[in-house]
C-alpha cells in the first residue's frame, strides 16, 4: 500500500512524526550503507535508509521510503520523523542570547513537505529488493545519435537471484570496460549467476557482502577498490 503525505508545517519548536502501530511486534531493523542493522526499540531516535521493518510473527512489516531517515520505535508503534521546527545554529554558549528577541526568526523545516511511503509485509530477504523497486523507478534518457558511428552490438544484463541487488554499473575510470557492484543485503549466503552479454559468472556472496565485477567481453571479480 502506497502512502503519500503532503504536510504544511508552520509551527515552532515542535516535531511531527508519522505513527504506525504494529501488532505482535518484535525485532526492529533498518537499512544502512551496504547492510542491515538492528535498531533500538526503547524510544531512542535511530537512523535507517530505504527501509525500516518490524518483525511481526514470521514476517516483517516494512516501511519503504525515499524521503526521510530518522524515527524511533516504542510500545509497539513505529514513529517516522517528518519535520522538526527548531532554530538553526541556536547552540547555547554561556549566557549568549540564542536568537534575537526583537525580530522574527524562521525555524527549520517550515513550509510544504511531500513524503512517499510504501507499506509491505514480506520476508527479511525481500526487504532490500522491494526498497530498490520503490526507489528506483524506470526512466528514459533523451539521446540524439548523430549516425556517424557504427552501433555496438546490444547486450543484456541479468542477475539470476532476484535478492542480489545490482547497485552500480558504470564505465571504468582506469581501463576499457565496465564496473559492476552487487550486494547481498541478507544474513545468509547467496549465489547468483551474473550475465552481461555472452559472458556469465557464478558468484557466491557471504552475508551482507559486496562484490565488484569487471566486464570487458568477459567477467572478472575484482576487489572493492576498483573504480
What are these regions (language model features)?
Residues 1-227:
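Terminal accessory/anchoring regions of large secretory-pathway or extracellular enzymes
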Amino acid at each position: 500500500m502506497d502512502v503519500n503525505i503532503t504536510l504544511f508545517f508552520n509551527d515552532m519548536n515542535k516535531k511531527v512524526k508519522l505513527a504506525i502501530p504494529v501488532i505482535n511486534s518484535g525485532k526492529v531493523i533498518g537499512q544502512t550503507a551496504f547492510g542491515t542493522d538492528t535498531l533500538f526499540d526503547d524510544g531512542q531516535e535511530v537512523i535507517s535508509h530505504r527501509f525500516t521493518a518490524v518483525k511481526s510473527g514470521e514476517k516483517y512489516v516494512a516501511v519503504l521510503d525515499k524521503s526521510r531517515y530518522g524515527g524511533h520505535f516504542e510500545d509497539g508503534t513505529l514513529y517516522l520523523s517528518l519535520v522538526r521546527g527548531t532554530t538553526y545554529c541556536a547552540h547555547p554558549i554561556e549566557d549568549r542570547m540564542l536568537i534575537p528577541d526583537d525580530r522574527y526568526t524562521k525555524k527549520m523545516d517550515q513550509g510544504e513537505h511531500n513524503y512517499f511511503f510504501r507499506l509491505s509485509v514480506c520476508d527479511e530477504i525481500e526487504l532490500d529488493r522491494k526498497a530498490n523497486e520503490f526507489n528506483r523507478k524506470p526512466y528514459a534518457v533523451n539521446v540524439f545519435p548523430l549516425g556517424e558511428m557504427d552501433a555496438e552490438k546490444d547486450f543484456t544484463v541479468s542477475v539470476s537471484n532476484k535478492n542480489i541487488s545490482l547497485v552500480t554499473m558504470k564505465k571504468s575510470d582506469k581501463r576499457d570496460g565496465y564496473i559492476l557492484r552487487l550486494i547481498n543485503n541478507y544474513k545468509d549466503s547467496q549465489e547468483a549467476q551474473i550475465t552481461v552479454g555472452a559472458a556469465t559468472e557464478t558468484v557466491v556472496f557471504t552475508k551482507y557482502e559486496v562484490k565488484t565485477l569487471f566486464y570487458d567481453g568477459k567477467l572478472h571479480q575484482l576487489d572493492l577498490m576498483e573504480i
